[in-house]
């Protein structure tokens, strides 16, 4: 009876160790799948970037900038905001 107790503890310890090893192996395999998925996503994003860099063109000259060209274009106190915006709009 005294010898069966340590033997049972040894069997339980071996089963726990085996369970830990199996769990670690599955976790390592899952990390490998994550890396493969990440590599696939990066490849897809690179292909999208290559496609859109060929298809999309910059729109130079299509939009007017809404900021004054010169620092002196600050609204003078005697000029109303409507006059200032009309003068600014004429410049376009």
UniProtKB/Swiss-Prot annotation:
**Positions annotated as propeptide:** 28-51, 64-92
Top-rank taxon of the source lineage equals Eukaryota
Q: Which residues carry this modification: Phenylalanine amide?
A: 60
Let me know which tissues express this protein, per UniProt: Widely expressed in the nervous system. Expressed in corpora cardiaca, hypocerebral ganglion, frontal ganglion, protocerebrum, antennal lobe, tritocerebrum and thoracic ganglia. Not detected in corpora allata, pars intercerebralis, circumesophageal connectives, subesophageal ganglion, abdominal ganglion and abdominal perisympathetic organs.
Q: What does the further note read?
A: The nonapeptide is a truncated form of the predicted neuropeptide F sequence. The predicted form, which extends from 28-60, is probably processed to a nonapeptide via cleavage at a K-X(6)-R-Y motif. Initial cleavage by a prohormone convertase presumably occurs C-terminally of Arg-50, with the remaining Tyr-51 removed by an aminopeptidase afterwards. The predicted form might be expressed in ovary or midgut.
User: What function does the entry list?
Assistant: Accelerates ovarian maturation in females.
Q: Which UniProt keywords apply?
A: Amidation, Cleavage on pair of basic residues, Neuropeptide, Secreted, Signal
Where found?
Secreted
Signal peptide start-end: 1-27
User: Hey, which family's this protein in?
Assistant: Belongs to the NPY family.
Q: Which GO terms describe its cellular component?
A: extracellular region
Q: Know the name of this protein? A: Neuropeptide F
């Amino acid at each position: 009876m005294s010898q069966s107790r340590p033997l049972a503890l040894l069997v339980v310890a071996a089963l726990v160790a085996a369970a830990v090893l199996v769990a670690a192996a599955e976790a390592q395999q899952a990390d490998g799948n994550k890396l493969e998925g990440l590599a696939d996503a990066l490849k897809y994003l690179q292909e999208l970037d290559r496609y859109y860099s060929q298809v999309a063109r910059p729109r130079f000259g299509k939009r007017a900038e809404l900021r004054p060209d010169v620092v002196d274009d600050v609204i003078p106190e005697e000029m109303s905001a409507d006059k200032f915006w009309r003068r600014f709009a004429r410049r376009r």
